[in-house]
Amino acid sequence: MAGAQPGVHALQLEPPTVVETLRRGSKFIKWDEETSSRNLVTLRVDPNGFFLYWTGPNMEVDTLDISSIRDTRTGRYARLPKDPKIREVLGFGGPDARLEEKLMTVVSGPDPVNTVFLNFMAVQDDTAKVWSEELFKLAMNILAQNASRNTFLRKAYTKLKLQVNQDGRIPVKNILKMFSADKKRVETALESCGLKFNRSESIRPDEFSLEIFERFLNKLCLRPDIDKILLEIGAKGKPYLTLEQLMDFINQKQRDPRLNEVLYPPLRPSQARLLIEKYEPNQQFLERDQMSMEGFSRYLGGEENGILPLEALDLSTDMTQPLSAYFINSSHNTYLTAGQLAGTSSVEMYRQALLWGCRCVELDVWKGRPPEEEPFITHGFTMTTEVPLRDVLEAIAETAFKTSPYPVILSFENHVDSAKQQAKMAEYCRSIFGDALLIEPLDKYPLAPGVPLPSPQDLMGRILVKNKKRHRPSAGGPDSAGRKRPLEQSNSALSESSAATEPSSPQLGSPSSDSCPGLSNGEEVGLEKPSLEPQKSLGDEGLNRGPYVLGPADREDEEEDEEEEEQTDPKKPTTDEGTASSEVNATEEMSTLVNYIEPVKFKSFEAARKRNKCFEMSSFVETKAMEQLTKSPMEFVEYNKQQLSRIYPKGTRVDSSNYMPQLFWNVGCQLVALNFQTLDVAMQLNAGVFEYNGRSGYLLKPEFMRRPDKSFDPFTEVIVDGIVANALRVKVISGQFLSDRKVGIYVEVDMFGLPVDTRRKYRTRTSQGNSFNPVWDEEPFDFPKVVLPTLASLRIAAFEEGGKFVGHRILPVSAIRSGYHYVCLRNEANQPLCLPALLIYTEASDYIPDDHQDYAEALINPIKHVSLMDQRARQLAALIGESEAQAGQETCQDTQSQQLGSQPSSNPTPSPLDASPRRPPGPTTSPASTSLSSPGQRDDLIASILSEVAPTPLDELRGHKALVKLRSRQERDLRELRKKHQRKAVTLTRRLLDGLAQAQAEGRCRLRPGALGGAADVEDTKEGEDEAKRYQEFQNRQVQSLLELREAQVDAEAQRRLEHLRQALQRLREVVLDANTTQFKRLKEMNEREKKELQKILDRKRHNSISEAKMRDKHKKEAELTEINRRHITESVNSIRRLEEAQKQRHDRLVAGQQQVLQQLAEEEPKLLAQLAQECQEQRARLPQEIRRSLLGEMPEGLGDGPLVACASNGHAPGSSGHLSGADSESQEENTQL
């Protein structure tokens, strides 16, 4: 695999195990400070380790998802009750002095800010400690966090089984709540499984086995996507796969082609048989070595079929390289829980950051106020709250190594201008951290030029301090007096101002009264700014009003220098930044704590290279770092090979938003600090990336960013010699249980990496009101060339149609497996979600240029290639002489690399992605080339930037939400009208039938007397004929009256349907026009974005050309720079003109496509109107016959049993049967067409 370590990694991860004590349960008193409640409960954990559960006072089972537990604490770190009543009940103040050891606090929550504290007190001694340790192990288990799809479904089943009511039964309402997106669908699935489905009912646990639950899920969430996969891989209509088909599928589709076949051999028949035995539920299929669709579905969700290999999750990289060789998980302003101006500071944030894998936290320390004079942490010159430094250090000592044993860096931003309080800070560090605090450098790594930094392995369990260091200059130095004099003057002025004002908080400014001469860090140091400068801008009104709050511009300037020394360039303007614009100088006590992380002011990469001190590091605000990244990217990479660099957000991010960390990982910056309290895409990417390598907080940088003999340009667009590029295709097939609402869902696929590798906002269409089991199965998203896969990450995220976040997953590109896989989604804080998942298909492989594909195929299957050569030789022998054939064979063998013919694919299984066109590779010209690009290359550049915008097809617009709502309303209106007509028709029919029956009875009575004598037979016959004639005329009148009513009703329905059709056509036309307007707006935005992107590419090429020119002959440098600028202007003008021409052509194509859609709509309108008129006419023509048949029937007595007669006899309106329902179905079909 690209970027993998040689050999097979020995997996160290272990699955979660629940000890007997937790399964059996223990007695605790659960107490709550807010409600003053305390209840005796029995805590238990289910055998799988999914949930912590207990029975509350209402006899309902409460559960806590163990994966949401962020920490467990006992002893002095657990929360103590403050309520006197609770303290009395728990026994505090009594003779038992070991009560603290019985306390346990469970911290849980969806993110580090919104945490919930559950407080327990064990009844027996030592119970709390066992529970705290075991619960924490379960919560932090990496395999549990990355469980298979089947495991998460089993987890949902376990929750339902645990949450029983007082009778020990499973309430149906809990099932409806778990699958709340479509409750009707849930009820139908429960009923089809023979289970109770009424909300008020409950189910016996023995009736709800795991097999029944799986059957319920299959009924609830139909899977046509898996049926299609089975068909594609060779089932061919059969409901099963044979052993050979399954083995071929796993070896050809599910196998990573980048793996070595010796170290990772293909699946053998015996192994495939074991998979069938594990996943196939049907015994008959099992006996025949076959896998059914249900067994295949289980296999896809099994642990063997994860999207990532387990070694990617394990601690699998070399941890013995210098610290500078790693990306280190870092936090900025760790104490804040919200914004930068008025947010709340919290000690808990330090715990949560460290537990989340952060290895570098920031401490902004300020001088404490009398009388305590305790240093505290806050964000200076803002209204953020304060927390004591001592509490923070104790929290760090408690949690520093609970999730990772590797070193923690304390990044001090020191504003304590009191020698006494700085000494107190140092003493706190020594006493609280003890032996964990690294004070003296390691013997193997002295603080000397050229000596590399120690490794994370060397520093395991150690805490390092980053703080300005005090250096004493040599006594006989030539410029010592020159340095000392201005500093002494500055210090005397500061001392006088300190004596006059005695400020003690950052809100009023903190003068550097303890600044001492000679604090140079080996570099020239400028004068301190007058300490009371910020007060000039306050005025009396500002002082009376309260704390001085900086504006965004001031904050950016302040943050820009927060960890650097003062600017020494007198030409640069100064600003009123307050004392927080620079740290105060360190005293001797704090300086002795600094060793391998010594901050210095950054001057240039050349100066740092000459000093060659690996233990010196510099901090960059993101804007300055971007400037260096843009101007000198390769030098930045070289700097980060030896020394550490820390990047932090600019001060204008007052909302605590984050920059994209990938920008600075690309140049090898180690300490890329982010605001952990803001879970935006940048923080989500950070959390996802640092999940790997055992969540150690350290990720080894790619080899080219570490080796001193290799140079690396992060802006390269070509394959780098020695780095195996990758190709990746991702097809989003379907989703399952993505939301608890009945809404549309869409999926975005992004790639983050080098600029050439980064792709944003690939997106599927939005499903139509289906969040249970949407199926997309669209064209794949293609990433044809990933230049540096070990630094690239894939993000797959699902959203509701309104843009609400559903879940996402961050995957390292170099570890993604090929084939069909479930991606179980995570929340913003990277915690696993139980039910939401996506089924995707991936093709991951080593990148091969198109002109080398034939060579690659020959190397993959050399036997087939040689056989093809032999076959060609034999064919030649039949046409020419034997001797010439031999010569031709030799020639063929000599030139086979140039004459490789087209070969049939060695893979007999068709790919679901074969139908999609392959994206052409990007331009192969180096952006650093100083020659003007050829027209063909420039056209490739335009094509790579330009995105196509196609008009929305009419069929897709018919599914628009507005049209769906209109159709629903029209169908409801038509149903109401028909019900009204049916009632009238049934009433009239009943009256007519009664009249016919009465008339017939009267006629028989009149004829009956004549039947007693035989003398008047002729007269009786005549009377009978007259009676029959009168009866027939009466019948005709009855039929005619019903016919007139039905004709009027049919005409009314026809008129209503015509109105509906015209409304629907009008609404469809409006939808088309709205879609066209939206596309034009989007096209305009795309035009601007493409122009900016083109300009960025051209500017980057110019910068690279200038950099190359500077490294060549200095005498020709000026002339060459002038020529580069001239060519840049010419190429920019020409490229923008070509881009505008291409954009105009794209606009014309879009207009033509939209006109075609409107023309299609215009052509369909008369057809639909004519079709409706014909349907109504035919329905009217059928009325006489239908009414006579319904009213009179075909019986000789004259009274039939047609639908209307039946309805009239039963006394209710007809349902879906009969002649009245035909128009209804026609209307539904007509609406479906729209």
Swiss-Prot record:
According to the UniProt entry, how is activity regulated? Activated by G(q)/G(11) G alpha proteins in response to ligand-binding to G protein-coupled receptors.
Query: N-acetylalanine (modified residue): where?
Result: 2
Q: What InterPro entries is this protein classified in?
A: C2_dom (IPR000008), C2_domain_sf (IPR035892), EF-hand-dom_pair (IPR011992), PI-PLC_fam (IPR001192), PLC-beta (IPR016280), PLC-beta_C (IPR014815), PLC-beta_C_sf (IPR042531), PLC-beta_PH (IPR037862)
Which spans does this entry mark as compositional bias, Low complexity?
488-515, 925-936
GO BP term, pick one: phospholipase C-activating serotonin receptor signaling pathway
Q: Which residues form the PI-PLC X-box domain?
A: 318-468
Database matches in Gene3D superfamilies: 2.30.29.240, C2 domain, EF-hand, Phosphatidylinositol (PI) phosphodiesterase, Phospholipase C beta, distal C-terminal domain
Consequence of mutating residue 878 to S?
In SMDCD; strong reduction in protein levels and marked increase in cellular phosphatidylinositol 4,5 bisphosphate levels in patient cells
Say yes or no: keyword Protein transport present.
no
- EC number(s) given by UniProt: 3.1.4.11
What effect on the protein does mutating residue 260 to A have, as reported in its record? Reduced ability to promote the GTPase activity of G(q)/G(11) G alpha proteins
Q: Name one GO cellular component term.
A: cytosol
Q: Does the keyword Lipid metabolism apply?
A: yes
MF (Gene Ontology): cadherin binding; calcium ion binding; calmodulin binding; molecular adaptor activity; molecular function activator activity; phosphatidylinositol-4,5-bisphosphate phospholipase C activity; phospholipase C activity
**What happens upon changing residue 855 to A?**
Abolished ability to transduce G(q)/G(11) G alpha signaling
User: How changing residue 863 to A affects the protein?
Assistant: Abolished ability to transduce G(q)/G(11) G alpha signaling
Region annotation (Disordered) maps to 467-587, 887-937, 1198-1234
**Where are the stretches annotated Interaction with SHANK2?**
1231-1234
Keywords from the UniProt entry:
Acetylation, Calcium, Cytoplasm, Dwarfism, Hydrolase, Lipid degradation, Lipid metabolism, Membrane, Nucleus, Phosphoprotein, Transducer
Catalytic residues, per the record, are 332, 379
> Subunit notes for this chain?
Interacts with SHANK2. Interacts with LPAR2.
Q: Check the record and name the PANTHER family matching this protein.
A: 1-PHOSPHATIDYLINOSITOL 4,5-BISPHOSPHATE PHOSPHODIESTERASE BETA-3, PHOSPHOINOSITIDE-SPECIFIC PHOSPHOLIPASE C FAMILY PROTEIN
Q: What is this protein called?
A: 1-phosphatidylinositol 4,5-bisphosphate phosphodiesterase beta-3
Q: Which organism is it from?
A: Homo sapiens
Its ancestry begins with: Eukaryota, Metazoa, Chordata, Craniata, Vertebrata
